[in-house]
Amino acid sequence: MKKILIYLGIFLTLSFIGHSYIIFRFIHDGVLFTGPNDGIEQMIPIQMFLFDKWSVGNLFYATDFGLGGDFFTDLSYYFSTNILFIINVLCIILLKTIIHINTQGLLFWMVNALVISIIKASLAMYCTYLYSKFISRNTWISIIMAFLFVMSPLYYRFTVYWPFFSDVFIWMPLLLFSIERTLQKQKFGLFIVTITLIMINNFYFAYYLCLIGAGYILLRIIFRHSKDIIPRGKALILFAISAILGLGNSLFMFFHGVQSFLNNRRVPFSGTVNTFEKLDINTNIFFDNYLIVLLFLTIQALLCIKLYKHFYYRLFAILTFAFILLSFVPFIDQLFNGFSAPQKRWHFILSFNSAILIGLFLKYFRTLKVKSYLISNIIAEIIIFASAITYHKFVAWLVLVPIVSLIGLLILILKDRRYRINLSYIFGISIILLNLMVSFVFIKNQIYFKDHQERANTFYINSSLYSSDLQRSLVNTMENSKREDERIDWRVNEQDNTPMYQHFKGLSLYSSIFHHNILDYYYDALKINLAEESLSRYQSINGRQNIASLFAVRYMMLKDYQGNLPAYFKKVKTSGQYSIYENTLNLPSVKVTKNVYNSKSLKTSIDREHAMLNGVIMDNAGKSFKQPESNLLSKVDMQQQNIKQIGKNRYKVSGGKGGTIKLHLPKQIRDKYNDFYLTMKIKRGNPDSNYTVAINNYANHRLFNNSTYRTGVDTQLYRTHPDKNGDITITLSPDGEFYVDLQQLNGENYDTLKKAHDNANFDTSYYDIKNGIQVQLSHHESGIASINIPYRKGMRAYVDGQPAKIQKVNYMMTSVPVEKNAKQIVIKYQPPYWNTMIFISLMSMILSAVFVKIINSKKRKMRK
């Protein structure tokens, strides 16, 4: 134990050194080690949200998780099953009992991210050291390998934007170490534990690591080391059994992570992918690019064929060379991303291979002849300096390249053993310094670029662009003036996780995974248009009054320049550039109704809104909706400008100012309705690009067809009203071809909403409890109690203490049947099969212990 602590102390020191530039920039310039996009928009808000819920004992369900939902399952891609984060939360809770910590403050979580990165890097170096020491039998070289891998540019890139990505720097070396230990010592315990932890930690990277582990096992079984003691066939069987046991051990967490993926709605990637990528500054992995930089020594080590006689040197030389070639094949990016859109997230494997290869080169290079060393070194340096000349880019670490090379050469030239040993240590230190300089330059050029410095700093996070004192004060004012079950429609610019870090019940969420019920509701049932198309977000209600009232939105806050205000919101407060509007036709979040409509009878979004206002919508139950709104498209005049029809529903825009399709509405129609819903199918043609659909003063920015983040939903609904001339103007830009199919134009006079508002019972409401809600019912008839929170399988309902049936209504909401005298509804949530998975995991853990004991006893008998 003492030895472990010593090494952890060494690696903690090295980690501080590796983070020294980051710490300096934070203290001196206030620059954060958290990215300006996903970092402060996703990672920090999600961590704050999880801490807020867990610290009060709410583990699974919350109504303020966007529109509400199972945050434990849906955030398993991020942090809800992340072992390091769970330990981090427990430590913070413990510290809060001793000292005052402002966990509501953003800066605390920004600093926490840096502290955790330092600790994580220390653990990662220790795990890499264990593997390196096992295969090299050299402590000094193993420390160098660990530093080269963990303190490489990719670790910083992962950590600054997606901190859970860099967990692989711990798990991959530990996995490979457990495999080697199994093959050479027949000890399966660590392998089973490692598989268990990997599966628990993150289901997405469990897939990566399973591919890596399976590939490594196959390689090591095919190409055996002289110290391997398990026969090939037996090794395959025992590894398979161990992996299954590890999976079983993890099911109490892993199962729910997989459920989040299966419940997600994501369009299959259908874009074109090149067979190969060309070599340029972005793909040259030996020079300063945005993703990964391998030291020039990697090239030199690959060229030293004589050293291939050593088993692990040969293994990692082949792996390094193979993965260098594969880095130019986009299909590999798709393979590691589950055969979806290509994502460059697997390059940590290449970084690891390179680090191990350089370490082994350092161990064996003294057996080279001077000529071999010089030839391989000169070729490596030519590649590096040729890159600098080609890209017209000088980076500071180039100065160290010839110095490192010269030290290595001196070791070969000098005959005195004492000098050679001392120079060998200096050579190792010089490689560490080179790696450090490469990483610092990478951080400066590829992470701390202009946008990062401007948007990821201590000033920005307290400004009006992210979270100012005035914003938080106004949010508190709205919070104190509404009921607990009412919502606030507000977000800072494009910060869709504003509700998470300003602590209110909002309407928006930015996450990679959503339960499909919510997206089905947004995309299909009501066709709520997102101003900025993205598969990873939902936001607001596109100014649609009916939906605002259905979700009990009490207040909306807008900046001076923002518009798209719902029809019956009135201004109640102005402060600086902000205005607060109150919903004058709000509805309670809970209602009891006898009216049930069959979803199959509803054909348009406006009819679905009216059905929800009058009653509830169910699948395969209820009566037909008898009051459909008429399509007004046949009653409008249409004109075009800068746009030419080139086929059925195909148009071409030219002129550089956008093409317009103008719909003129007769006065009698304009006088009859307050708002209009325009439904159209719109898709970009050639040339493919991002494009904008502007409906009068509202701009909808949509993604190019090949975009990874495109929703794949081409039929859009725009709430609008005519200008002073009675026109609804559709403007398409930029120039090029579009597919446009105008499908519906419906008018809305809000008579249905007004009637629902007048008849509403505002004495009925809910308040949040741990993992659920409690509804207090006032006077009502028997019927269905509809509650505007997302339904999830795993909910249990109790009416006045007695179990009751619970089901989905309104495409995503929750309902419970109640009798006339019912007073209270309690809804509790636990992820489906929670107890079952815990039981299976416990049984699997017992079997794992028995399996390891049997294997160990057989091994002892073999020794006798």
Question: How should these model regions be labeled?
Answer:
Residues 47, 634-864:
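Active-site-proximal, structured, solvent-exposed surfaces of multi-pass membrane proteins
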Residues 84, 126, 502-610, 614-635, ...:
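A cross-kingdom signal targeting lumenal/periplasmic-facing segments of multi-pass membrane
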Residues 41, 45-50, 83, 89, ...:
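Periplasmic/ER-lumenal interhelical loops and adjacent helix-loop junctions
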Residues 74-79, 434-458, 479-547, 587, ...:
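Extracytoplasmic/lumenal acceptor-recognition loop(s) of multi-pass membrane glycoenzymes
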